């Protein structure tokens, strides 16, 4: 049974998760000698995935870890975590970090709602549709989106959005069909992503040649990514796929705020309005979901099993 209390717990988990995830781009920007986007992404998944993997092994034990690891779709989802990072870090220099977030996170929210309907998790509510549309409009204002962008960058960001949507929908399905904790399932996903990223990370780590860069990588992996995914798992466990992806639109808002305080970036009036629009839309969604749980009884919803 998913209660109102559980829904609120899921929302809080996503808020904390988006805080940690929003620091990723800023961490790379303040490095002394940052490596290629692909290398930084690989190190992030390698260390962060290993961190949450060790955490869930300690908390849930080898038996539960192995039970989830034996599920074929889990390996597919593990690969999605790595492919998502590669796609995002490829798109960023092509079309910009902000627009990459707009395309990837915006499309993932729409696709997650669509997949939820197709796979029987319930039709999107009017509040979810309104909140998502308004939030994406706000994100468009925040990023200053324009049409002069490279097609390959757009396609990469859309691919990242597809990976994120499938990850959330199939991840929620795995949690329900296996009756497993969201942190455990997300931890196994990330452990697989860590194994896939390890060769790329270890082969491209020559740029980590200063104490500050080492400390930032250790923050980006074991702290931001590990802790971020622990709280993300709480959101996956308690909320619907569409709501998870829509609430995560907070991530680019957080990245913008970090850019202002740490990188001396300027926020235009249009960008400020965009931030306020996003926050208003997500506040509406969060209030609605905290009052009425998304899933009254997990036994009654559809699964992909």
Language-model-detected regions and their locations in the chain:
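Glycine-/small-residue-enriched transmembrane alpha-helix faces in small-molecule transporters
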Residues: 1-43, 48, 79, 83, ...
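C-terminal-most transmembrane helix of multi-pass membrane proteins
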Residues: 2-3, 45, 49, 213, ...
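Juxtamembrane helix-entry segments on the extracytoplasmic side of multipass membrane proteins
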Residues: 6-11, 34-42, 66-71, 144-163, ...
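Hydrophobic/small/kink-forming positions within alpha-helical transmembrane segments
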Residues: 22, 26, 78, 82-86, ...
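Hydrophobic/aromatic residues within transmembrane alpha-helices
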Residues: 30-31, 40, 44, 91-92, ...
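Specific alpha-helical transmembrane segments that line the substrate/conduction pathway
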Residues: 39-50, 89-122, 241-260
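Hydrophobic transmembrane alpha-helices of multi-pass small-molecule transport proteins
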Residues: 52, 81, 124-144, 164, ...
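Specific transmembrane alpha-helical segments of multi-pass solute transporters/efflux pumps
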Residues: 53-99, 141, 221-239
């Amino acid at each position: 049974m998913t209660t109102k209390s559980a829904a609120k717990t899921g929302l809080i988990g996503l808020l904390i998760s988006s805080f940690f995830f929003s620091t990723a781009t800023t961490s790379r920007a303040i490095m002394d000698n940052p490596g290629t986007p692909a290398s930084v992404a690989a190190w992030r998944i390698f260390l962060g995935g290993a961190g949450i993997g060790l955490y869930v092994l300690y908390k849930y034990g080898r038996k539960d870890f192995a039970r989830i690891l034996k599920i074929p779709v889990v390996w597919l989802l593990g690969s999605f975590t790595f492919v998502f990072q590669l796609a995002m870090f490829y798109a960023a220099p092509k079309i910009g970090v902000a627009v990459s977030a707009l395309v990837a996170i915006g499309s993932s929210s729409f696709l997650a709602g669509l997949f939820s309907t197709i796979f029987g998790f319930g039709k999107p509510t009017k509040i979810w549709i309104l909140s998502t549309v308004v939030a994406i409009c706000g994100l468009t204002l925040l990023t200053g989106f324009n049409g002069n962008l490279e097609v390959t960058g757009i396609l990469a960001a859309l691919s990242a959005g597809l990976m994120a949507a499938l990850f959330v929908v199939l991840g929620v399905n795995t949690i329900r069909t296996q009756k497993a904790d969201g942190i455990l399932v997300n931890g196994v996903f990330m452990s697989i992503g860590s194994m896939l990223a390890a060769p790329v990370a270890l082969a491209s780590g020559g740029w980590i040649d200063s104490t500050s860069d080492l400390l930032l990588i250790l923050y980006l992996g074991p702290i931001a990514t590990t802790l971020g995914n622990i709280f993300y798992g709480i959101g996956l466990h308690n909320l619907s796929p569409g709501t998870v992806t829509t609430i995560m639109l907070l991530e680019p808002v957080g990245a913008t705020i970090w850019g202002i305080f740490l990188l001396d970036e300027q926020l235009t009036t249009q960008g400020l309005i965009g931030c306020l629009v996003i926050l208003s839309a997500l506040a509406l969604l969060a209030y609605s979901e905290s009052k009425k749980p998304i899933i009254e009884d997990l036994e009654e919803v559809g699964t992909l099993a």
